[in-house]
Amino acid sequence: MSDRNPLIDADRRADEDNTLRPQTLDDFVGQAAARANLKVFIEAAKVRGEALDHVLFVGPPGLGKTTLAQIMAKELGVNFRSTSGPVIAKAGDLAALLTNLEERDVLFIDEIHRLSPAVEEILYPAMEDFQLDLIIGEGPAARSVKIDLAKFTLVAATTRLGLLTTPLRDRFGIPVRLNFYTVEELEYIVRRGARIMQMGISSDGAREVARRSRGTPRIAGRLLRRVRDFALVAGADIIDRRIADEALSRLEVDNRGLDQLDRRYLNIIARNFGGGPVGIETIAAGLSEPRDAIEDIIEPYLIQQGFLQRTPRGRVLTAVAWQHLGLPAPAEIIQQSQYGLFMEDE
């Protein structure tokens, strides 16, 4: 009989995705400021012999939130337990997780913004006082029971900071925002991945994959694996720029890292709504994609690259987007661009 807890993803998957993950903070590429601060906080916690304060990672998907949480547990020399907000359906699920933690263990909750209010209420005293306040029974026979917990570290991740309630957000002593990676950082990650895969790659080949990876290591790893497949079938011993370009073009990833869905998004606003402003619900209906996916996956990179601007009236394409689509921009967009009203996010 298996004693595996379905709430905890304890599978040791030997796939390439995990093989490519860095194992220490020194191996982790990018997020220099965040890594430097985490090193200090981890070392201080070890010196004090106490649990690390609770950590909240904020940023788009694929930037390394889960990997950093695993590395933190390893550097602290403690156990790592992982789950996600949607999986914790009721208070009893969370209680089962928390009561099985040992002193200073790391519990990672991905998508913490998707916790139900009832579960979130249980989490407050657990984070602050390391106690569970449970109601046993119903009606007049109901009674409150307090259960002491081991002093643990909650590491949480969210792509939607605004959806976290203030009481929950304020209980994280170490908030960490993760940003998109530079092409240089991704190029290093791609070259490292190719070495692990035992596949040769040239500098310009690695750079071609890197600059089409949307500033995201997870996407860089995925694209590298697909480019490797094209190279192997073509009988190439090394991935050069030509092979990378041909493979990525066949995958419909353009020279700015935009895929078919990104271009559909831009084209809907450009062709159907004259460049905007247009509301997110209208765009979601046009794409047949959920609003959350658009706001979490598509829009952050488009905004960061200067293709899109959010305004109180809706989404508006910038002159950069019109140029990328090969369409003539409306006169007012050109004027606004000249006056610097559409600027790329820093």
Curated annotation (Swiss-Prot):
Instruction: Please name the Gene3D superfamilies in this protein's record.
Output: 1.10.8.60, P-loop containing nucleotide triphosphate hydrolases, Winged helix-like DNA-binding domain superfamily/Winged helix DNA-binding domain
Q: Where is the signal peptide?
A: none
Positions binding DNA in this chain are: 291, 310, 315
Q: Sorted alphabetically, which keywords does the UniProt record give?
A: ATP-binding, Cytoplasm, DNA damage, DNA recombination, DNA repair, DNA-binding, Hydrolase, Nucleotide-binding
Query: Which residues does the annotation say bind Mg(2+)?
Result: 66
Location relative to the cell: Cytoplasm
Single GO biological process annotation from the record = DNA recombination
Q: Where is this region: Large ATPase domain (RuvB-L)?
A: 1-181
Segments carrying the region annotation (Head domain (RuvB-H)) are 255-346
Record bears the keyword Cytoplasm: yes
Q: What is known of its domains?
A: Has 3 domains, the large (RuvB-L) and small ATPase (RuvB-S) domains and the C-terminal head (RuvB-H) domain. The head domain binds DNA, while the ATPase domains jointly bind ATP, ADP or are empty depending on the state of the subunit in the translocation cycle. During a single DNA translocation step the structure of each domain remains the same, but their relative positions change.
Protein name in the entry = Holliday junction branch migration complex subunit RuvB
Source taxonomy = Bacteria, Pseudomonadati, Pseudomonadota, Alphaproteobacteria, Hyphomicrobiales
